[in-house]
């Protein structure tokens, strides 16, 4: 039995939730998100409270209800407040520059990397070594940040590469003679 599924979701002021069948739409000041909920889950929207309950006769219904509750909560937080991930570029000559819908990265390769920013994501570069990924969809923000990081993951000897701002890179000692 899922403890997460049992907790109701409170809808903040300024956020509008509509349910049509198994499709839930959340509108807020930052945008609009739509998601189809699993058939094993029954969603009820009453005034400013959303509850997720499992349907009878489905084996993993409680797990699906917990997942649906977490996804709906992420949609509400995203449309109300938004999500952001901060990346740092560590290394000599590593730079980032946001130009319209592309992010130009200089990461020590023989060529610059041009990253196409997906729809629904905004990228800012407060400095040449910092990248801010912002958006409404939590999954898309995290995936975009992971895609940027994948170009040059932090290496364990000098710590050079693209890392999350809160990431601790485990350092290794150099080989001794």
From Swiss-Prot:
Gene Ontology CC annotation, any one: cytosolic large ribosomal subunit
Entry's Gene Ontology molecular function annotations: rRNA binding; structural constituent of ribosome
Gene Ontology biological process: cytoplasmic translation
Pfam families listed in its UniProt record: Ribosomal_L6
ATP-binding in keyword set: no
Compositionally biased tracts (Basic and acidic residues): 157-171
Region of interest: Disordered: 157-177
Keywords: Ribonucleoprotein, Ribosomal protein, RNA-binding, rRNA-binding
Subunit field text: Part of the 50S ribosomal subunit.
NCBIfam families listed in its UniProt record: L6_bact
Biological role stated in the UniProt entry: This protein binds to the 23S rRNA, and is important in its secondary structure. It is located near the subunit interface in the base of the L7/L12 stalk, and near the tRNA binding site of the peptidyltransferase center.
Family: Belongs to the universal ribosomal protein uL6 family.
Stated name of the protein: Large ribosomal subunit protein uL6
């Amino acid at each position: 039995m899922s403890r997460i599924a049992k907790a109701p979701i409170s809808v903040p002021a300024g956020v509008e939730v509509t349910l049509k069948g198994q499709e839930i739409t959340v509108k807020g000041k930052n945008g609009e998100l739509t998601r189809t909920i699993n058939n094993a889950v029954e969603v009820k929207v009453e005034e400013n409270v959303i509850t997720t309950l499992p349907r009878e006769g489905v084996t993993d219904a409680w797990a699906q209800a917990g997942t649906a509750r977490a996804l709906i909560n992420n949609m509400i937080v995203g449309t109300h407040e938004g999500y952001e991930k901060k990346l740092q570029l560590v290394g000599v000559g590593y730079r980032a520059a946001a130009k319209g819908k592309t992010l130009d990265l200089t990461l020590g390769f023989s060529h610059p990397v041009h990253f196409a920013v997906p729809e629904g994501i905004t990228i800012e570069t407060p400095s040449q070594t910092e990248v801010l990924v912002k958006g409404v969809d939590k999954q898309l923000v995290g995936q975009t940040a992971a895609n940027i990081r994948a170009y040059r993951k932090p290496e364990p000897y000098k710590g050079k590469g693209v890392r999350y701002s809160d990431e601790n890179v485990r350092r290794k000692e150099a080989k001794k003679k």
